[in-house]
């Protein structure tokens, strides 16, 4: 029997999260180098990074899928040489199209490192991932990276955390120098300066703090103590009584406050210049939680419906969450899972309580970004990959066969952008179906539908980049040659009034005829509530056996709305009357009658077309404020606020997605390439009348 190598208190499951280009992947790369996982450092801009292992990631220099890897940390000064820590790291994407990957990673992590660009501070996507981490109660430390970059300003970065994230965060280190002069780091807790002794930053030596920075270091240490004392009673008591606070006491208080989500330690460094990463790893060990420090994970017993606390314990029955599915070119389908409690051996059976199927785990793997080690057994608190699970998808619960539990699943957003994809040959058609199925298993925010009338396949997702990459993967990994249409907005349709309508279908053509007759009341439902069907038939005027056909007929009809053929959403339907014929009535006749009732209702129900509205963050030089305001109003947008961020201005707005296509080019030319923007789906809203008429003209339904 395999033995646990690292006790739970020496295990850390962490995520590295940030805005795109803050240097997340490079930071992870250095972690792997310093923990001995790789022997050569790969740079993202050379396309050689270990964590970016998909072709598209290497070409684009961005991280798309959160690769999981395991590293072992012995301490900056080998202080954990005899008791090393296992650190499981999930590198997450910073691009807004892939926030689903971030959500998915945060769900299974215990702690996170938020990486900031030292010249930009908190950026729009930082705010998004920070909010996501807060939702999942994930303790965080902040690593202000790129301190060697032109414009790097540590104080500005710390201030931006206070202003934009509104949290209690203070520096536990201070950089010596910035930009090209960034040379060392002051540890504010120990009041020592650390200087590198070699080019790769492997050896560092403590020195006295330079004379001109001593006063600043003392002042910043006091600021730190005050911030932690504010949320920690033990420290507050000592502080108020004017007692000396030892290094150990301060570190213990920082840990307590960080775990309680009441304080966020801030560190400085430059991953690219090999400075500060090992100190950040020490902070991961010192301040971020192990599996025993987080609040218990809640599961449900499907038999009794009672809630059960899952506490990391190898002696308890096995329970894990499948948080990612990937297709590996060498070993096939991989299921990444986080083990919450119990242990699991390769070759054993698990119960997938989400799909109510029993599955056999063929092999278990410990993952490094592109390589893997086979292991005999996984323990509570581990993150590992399993081979052989055929019916498991993202968000499924995997538990002991004799102790079945359902773990809280994950919610995935509805796609807002779609494009048509046309296979070039019949052989490509089959390959396309296979590719879509595999890619949708890996990324639940990617969907595909087929238009029943035209036979056209539409793929949908959260943004252009995501769909771009999916099409690229279809070509490279599945050899699908296809023609791709321009991106389109995923419009929806909805009723705005409550109406009653009759659907009557009768056909006599010699022999058995067809007869179905229904009266249905249609009413708008709340946004996002979907379709609700109510059977209010009394006295059997529509026999029981035909009622499911009425519901099925309505559901089919919802796929193509009355105005322009977009899906009809958020609708209540109440079947309250009807009639039937002893001989001629059938399921098919009632199905058709239901769809006729919906068609009839659409004439008076005030049907509208809904469009996705995006929350847009535009960052541009102050001189371009007028341009940006003009861009937003020309695109039917609403400005919601603006703030100054050093030399640039950030404008927040709500803009229809249909108006944002091609905006990157407009903004680039207006700001000479200095403006950037990000957008994320916010809500659906009815389009103005004149635009609705244009959309109907373009996509119009034939009566």
Swiss-Prot record:
Query: Its function?
Result: Catalyzes the GTP-dependent ribosomal translocation step during translation elongation. During this step, the ribosome changes from the pre-translocational (PRE) to the post-translocational (POST) state as the newly formed A-site-bound peptidyl-tRNA and P-site-bound deacylated tRNA move to the P and E sites, respectively. Catalyzes the coordinated movement of the two tRNA molecules, the mRNA and conformational changes in the ribosome.
Q: By its UniProt entry, which Pfam families does this protein fall under?
A: EF-G_D2, EFG_C, EFG_III, EFG_IV, GTP_EFTU
Q: Pinpoint the tr-type G domain residues.
A: 9-292
Which keywords belong to this entry? Answer: Cytoplasm, Elongation factor, GTP-binding, Nucleotide-binding, Protein biosynthesis
Q: What superkingdom does the record give?
A: Bacteria
Q: Does the keyword Protein biosynthesis apply?
A: yes
Instruction: Write the protein's name.
Output: Elongation factor G
PANTHER family for the chain = RIBOSOME-RELEASING FACTOR 2, MITOCHONDRIAL (PTHR43261:SF1), TRANSLATION ELONGATION FACTOR G-RELATED (PTHR43261)
> What species was this sequence derived from?
Leuconostoc mesenteroides subsp. mesenteroides (strain ATCC 8293 / DSM 20343 / BCRC 11652 / CCM 1803 / JCM 6124 / NCDO 523 / NBRC 100496 / NCIMB 8023 / NCTC 12954 / NRRL B-1118 / 37Y)
The record's section on SUPFAM superfamilies has: EF-G C-terminal domain-like, P-loop containing nucleoside triphosphate hydrolases, Ribosomal protein S5 domain 2-like, Translation proteins
Q: Which gene encodes it?
A: fusA
Any one GO cellular component localisation term in the record: cytoplasm
């Amino acid at each position: 029997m395999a033995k646990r190598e690292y006790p739970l208190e020496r295990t850390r499951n962490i995520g590295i999260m940030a805005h795109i280009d803050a240097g997340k992947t490079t930071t992870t790369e250095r972690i792997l180098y310093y923990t001995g996982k790789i022997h050569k450092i790969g740079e993202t801009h050379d396309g050689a990074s270990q964590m970016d292992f998909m072709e598209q990631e290497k070409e684009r220099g961005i991280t798309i899928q959160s690769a999981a890897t395991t590293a072992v940390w012995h301490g900056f000064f080998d202080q954990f040489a005899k008791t090393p820590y296992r650190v499981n790291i999930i590198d997450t994407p910073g691009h807004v199209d892939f926030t689903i990957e971030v959500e998915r990673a945060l769900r299974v992590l215990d702690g996170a490192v938020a990486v900031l660009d030292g010249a930009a501070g908190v950026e729009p996507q930082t705010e998004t991932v920070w909010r996501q981490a807060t939702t999942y109660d994930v303790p965080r430390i902040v690593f202000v990276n790129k301190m060697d970059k032109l414009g790097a300003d540590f104080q500005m970065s710390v201030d931006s955390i206070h202003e934009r994230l509104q949290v209690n965060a203070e520096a536990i280190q201070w950089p010596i120098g910035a930009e090209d002069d960034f040379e060392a780091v002051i540890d504010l807790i120990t009041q020592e300066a650390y200087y590198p002794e070699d080019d790769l930053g492997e050896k560092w030596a403590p020195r006295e703090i330079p004379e001109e920075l001593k006063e600043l270091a003392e002042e910043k240490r006091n600021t730190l103590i005050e911030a932690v004392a504010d949320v920690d009673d033990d420290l507050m008591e000592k502080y108020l009584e004017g007692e000396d606070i030892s290094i150990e006491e301060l570190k213990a208080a920082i840990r307590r406050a960080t775990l309680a989500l009441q304080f966020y330690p801030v560190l400085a460094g430059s991953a690219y210049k090999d400075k500060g990463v090992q100190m950040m790893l020490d902070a991961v060990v010192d301040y971020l939680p192990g599996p025993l420090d987080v609040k218990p994970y809640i599961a449900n017993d499907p038999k009794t419906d009672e809630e059960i606390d899952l506490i990391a314990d190898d002696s308890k029955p096995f329970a894990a969450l499948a948080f990612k599915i990937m297709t590996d070119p060498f070993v096939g389908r991989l299921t990444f899972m986080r083990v919450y409690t119990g242990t699991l051996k390769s070759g054993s059976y698990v119960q997938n309580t989400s799909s109510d199927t029993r599955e056999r785990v063929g092999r278990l793997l410990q993952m490094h970004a592109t390589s893997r080690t086979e292991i005999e057994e996984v323990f509570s608190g581990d993150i590992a990959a399993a081979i052989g699970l055929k019916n498991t998808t993202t968000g499924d619960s995997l538990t002991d066969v004799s102790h079945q539990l359902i773990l809280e699943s994950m919610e995935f957003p509805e796609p807002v952008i779609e494009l048509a994809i046309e296979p070039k040959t019949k052989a490509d058609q089959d390959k396309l179906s296979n590719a879509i199925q595999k890619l949708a298993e890996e990324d639940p925010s990617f969907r595909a539908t087929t238009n029943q009338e035209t036979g056209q396949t539409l793929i949908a997702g959260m943004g252009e980049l995501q769909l771009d990459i999916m099409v690229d993967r279809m070509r490279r990994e599945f050899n699908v040659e296809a023609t791709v249409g321009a991106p389109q907005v995923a419009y929806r349709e909805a009723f705005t009034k409550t109406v009653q309508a009759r659907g009557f279908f009768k056909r006599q053509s010699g022999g058995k005829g067809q007869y179905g007759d229904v009266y249905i009341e249609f009413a708008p439902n709340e946004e996002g509530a979907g379709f609700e069907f109510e059977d209010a038939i009394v006295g059997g005027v529509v026999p029981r056996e035909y009622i499911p056909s009425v519901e099925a007929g309505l559901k089919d009809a919802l796929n193509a709305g009355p105005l322009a053929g977009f899906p009809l959403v958020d609708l209540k339907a109440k079947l309250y009357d009807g009639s039937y014929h002893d001989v001629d009535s059938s399921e098919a006749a009632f199905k058709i009658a239901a769809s006729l009732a919906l068609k009839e209702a659409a004439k008076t129900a005030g049907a509208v077309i809904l469009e996705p509205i995006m929350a847009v963050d535009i960052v541009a030089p102050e001189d371009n404020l007028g341009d940006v305001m003009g861009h937003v109003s020309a695109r039917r947008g609403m400005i919601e606020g603006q703030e100054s961020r050093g030399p640039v201005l950030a404008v927040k707005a709500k803009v229809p997605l249909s108006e944002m296509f091609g905006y990157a080019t407009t903004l680039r030319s207006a700001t000479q390439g200095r403006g950037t923007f990000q957008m994320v789906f916010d809500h659906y809203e009815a389009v103005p009348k004149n635009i609705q008429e244009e959309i109907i003209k373009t996509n119009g339904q034939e009566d």
